[in-house]
Amino acid sequence: MSILVDVKTYLALDGAPKHVQDYLSVAVTDHAYLPKTEDITSDWVAYIAAPAFKLIRENLGHDVEAFASIGTGSGIDVLTGIELLGAKRVGFTDLQKSVVTAAAENIKKNLKNADSVELEFGAGDLLQPLQNGKRRYDVIYENLPNVPLTDNTKIEDKRNSGHYLEKRVEAIPEFVHEQMLDLHYLALKQARDYLADKGAVYSTLGGRVPLSAFIKLGELAGLSSEIFTYSWKVQAEPEDVISGYAAQEKAGLGPFRFYRASDLQKAFADISVKESGKNAFEIEKSLESSKLTATEAYEAFRKGEVIGHTVAVLKSSVK
């Protein structure tokens, strides 16, 4: 399928985009994550990544040279990195060749000047497809799935990009696995070999576990981590995702935390993106009495309530 994206609206730009077309024509393969362009508050790139990218650019005071995305899907996150960060070289990966090939075409055809950006890409596990490239990325972005596929489901069967194959050969700390942060940990472990000097990984993480768990995640991966931005969003694909967390909760993981969207809206009402990171733990504390377990959240969802979760952008860099 193909979608049309109004960039000015999608990225909340003050004027016309500088580097990408005004309207993106994006082909989305059957196995790629489908952007939520009809409801931007549910869209990871527009609602979570884009504000963080703008803040990165503001803090740096200049464009970045190189940007990478792990698990790009349609490539819309890479186009966002090009537009908001001014990246001249981009690397991107995804698990399946068909997804990466489509993403590359999407990126090329939606640039105002296709020759202005160097592309490095490949299909495979996390950052490994980029191992023979230039590496040294200033910004590495990842929004990887947390919920494993059920045993009888294959990654190729349907649009399973919100899930991952649980069987891994790498050693994963028990703490990380209990918090369902396996892929984020593995991405951080790999990333140190792909970062430029003073580069950082920006992990977009659904706050279904305590913020302290994210800081510990970075430490266990051998990096120095901080909460860069903190916000919330309505749970996308709630039937699938919340029930998935509830099942993992019953299996002994977690407990996980969700909230009614109305409670999240109140807690974040007066919080700017710029101030959100430094106030994250205080905001989390204010929501303590409103949190729901995954099981409770699923029951509330089945009764018609709108369920959401907090979102942290974790900034991790080499110590």
PLM regions: where:
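Conserved Class I SAM-dependent methyltransferase catalytic core
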Residues: 177-233
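Conserved SAM/SAH cofactor-binding pocket of Class I
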Residues: 44-152, 156
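Alpha-helical transmembrane segments of integral membrane proteins
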Residues: 248-257
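C-terminal beta-strand of the catalytic ATP-binding
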Residues: 144, 316-319
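Mobile active-site "lid"/loop adjacent to the S-adenosyl-L-methionine
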Residues: 139-183
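A generic structural motif
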Residues: 118-123, 225-239
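Short, surface-exposed amphipathic charged segments that create phosphate/polyanion-binding patches used
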Residues: 239-249
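SAM-dependent Rossmann-like transferase core, predominantly class I methyltransferases
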Residues: 2-89, 256-258, 262-315
